[in-house]
A protein has these predicted regions:
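Intrinsic-disorder/low-complexity regions
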Residues: 1, 11, 22, 48, ...
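Short linear motifs in intrinsically disordered
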Residues: 1, 28-33
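Hydrophobic beta-strand residues in large extracellular and virion-surface proteins
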Residues: 7-8, 21, 27, 40
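A short, exposed loop/beta-hairpin motif centered on an aromatic-Gly-Thr core
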Residues: 13-29
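Short, mixed-charge low-complexity intrinsically disordered segments
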Residues: 16, 33-64
Length: 64
């Protein structure tokens, strides 16, 4: 049984929000529609390790 889960971390004005998903499809969907800097992580509950899968808009600055 695959027990991996996925987290999308979204950065907004100094705050970081984590959204947990049971499957990669839903996590990638949030990554595709999110306008703020975000990253996608694969997580293993057995080892508590995270592996970076994708990072978007990391260097993009939004005008206020």
């Amino acid at each position: 049984m695959d027990t991996r889960y996925y987290i999308v971390m979204v950065q907004d004005y100094g705050e970081v929000y984590e959204y947990e998903f049971p499957d990669l499809y839903r996590a990638r969907y949030l990554m595709s529609v999110e306008q703020l800097p975000c990253s996608l992580w694969e997580c293993s509950p057995q080892s508590s390790n995270r592996r970076l899968l994708d990072s978007r808009n990391a260097t993009r600055k939004l005008a206020i």
